[in-house]
A protein has these predicted regions:
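Hydrophobic N-terminal alpha-helices or hydrophobic patches in metabolic proteins across all domains
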Residues: 1-167
Length: 167
């Protein structure tokens, strides 16, 4: 990536999909993990912040608010604007909410969580509250939303963990 200070999101799952793709670092490709059992779709593009390691040992998860869905494998320069706090059966699993830095007419002026309609934040929160409901042995506990400053902390922690692991 050209700018080491720029954040990039790698999209695993496009907005509107029920398919859950995950990046497999051993294969170097995205793999279809499963189709969601519930009749819900991802409310935003979903993936991870490149060159980070989250508290769960995986790259830091993110959602990218886009006017139109992209595609699995798309890399988007992003700005973080908040964090959705949650845990799943594996532990802490926070999601950084981002906007694209690509001239998106809908999200170009968003720079903090307060710039997002409360109804959309509720929709995203509801999705993560129920999206695993029908999967045996899977569960989520949702917290709430945090602001841009908290997102910056989560990403700094994730970048430091990645740097430490990379040696």
């Amino acid at each position: 990536m050209p700018d080491s200070n720029q954040l990039y999101a790698l999209v695993e799952i496009p907005k509107g999909s029920r398919n859950k793709y995950e990046y497999d670092p051993d294969l170097g490709h995205l793999v279809l993990d499963r189709t969601l059992w519930t009749s819900v779709v991802y409310p935003a593009d979903y993936g991870f912040i490149v060159d980070t390691i989250g508290r769960d040992g995986d790259p830091v998860d993110c959602l990218v608010l886009v006017a139109e869905p992209t595609f699995p494998g798309c890399v988007i320069p992003v700005e973080p604007i908040g964090v959705f706090e949650m845990t799943d059966e594996k532990g802490e699993d926070d999601k950084v909410l981002c906007v694209p830095l690509t001239g998106d007419p809908e999200w170009g002026e968003a720079h903090d969580i307060a710039d997002v309609r409360p109804a959309l934040l509720d929709e995203i929160g509801h999705f993560f509250d129920i999206y695993k409901d029908l999967e045996h042995g899977a569960d989520t506990v949702v917290g709430g939303w945090h602001d841009r400053a908290y997102a910056d902390e989560v990403i700094a922690e994730g970048r430091a963990a990645f740097t430490a692991a990379s040696g």
